Amino acid sequence: MKEQKVVETKNLRRFIKKLEIDTYGIADMHLLKEMETGFPIDLNNFLNMFPYAIVLGAQYGKLGKKASGGKTALFLEEAAFSIMEYLEDKGYRQLIIHTEDEFDPINRLGFMSLKLLAKKAGLGWQGRSLLIISPEYGPLHRLIAILTDLPLQNNQLIKNQCDDCRKCIEACPQNALTFVGFNDHPSRREDVLDIKTCLGDNGCLVCILSCPWLKKS
């Protein structure tokens, strides 16, 4: 199995490289099991069918002609469907996870947490605003994932580098963020973010623009 994982991972990475994806990683779904007590689905039902997640990320504003219609979301979706066809041709299951897959729009809960998948796939760490922060792109990127049963090697995790930084918390115009000094993931989203006062769905980008990692990237 280990040798198969090595071979399949190399082949998949070679295929993804042709798609010109900014960043991507692989997560072992079993790593999520103990992480999220308030997860909106029962992960046990998925572990046998979809033990791995392939997570793709694209930075906003740097896609140029790569994106159909200039839209990051569409570019990522096209890449994801190409990977799904790749998996189908090899005889493996595939299930796409979108940002828009909300089953609880009021509380902005998705079918599955893309942020959690991205973190476990080594794309970045979860910042004080709960956004995924990539060393290369900061918090300014979009995510999509494909779940599969193709045996793969998971990426190494990236250590949380926010430390005691509170820039996003202090900049939030709605005071929707509370500082919680977690290293990996807070036990509850509500401890960090008041989702009902957050203006993210209305185009507010303050927590993104105030992040020092955006400037570094």
Map each language-model feature to its residues:
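Non-catalytic, usually N-terminal nucleic-acid engagement modules in DNA/RNA processing proteins
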Residues: 1-72
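Catalytic cores of enzyme domains
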Residues: 65, 69-217
